[in-house]
């Protein structure tokens, strides 16, 4: 029982260290990273699809996701385009160099 408890504690410490590294060195939050992962795994994705992904487990406010997406776009982690059929829809995606950049971030943490 003690061994299992120690492993859980160590896993939590490792997790906290990874989150701290993400914030300090990469200037990304956990939500930013999850958004990048969702976009990385999709050819293109809408904000609604992002919200229905892993972010549901974090109980993130939908209004904050737009801010996160704008920040990631300004930092050139992602690209976006507006649908020609429905201008309300914005699609987010990554080009090859952005995917490579994300892969490096994921590897570093």
Spans of model-derived segments:
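N-terminal helix-turn-helix DNA-binding core of bacterial DNA-binding proteins
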Residues: 20-60
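Short amphipathic alpha-helical interaction segments
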Residues: 59-74
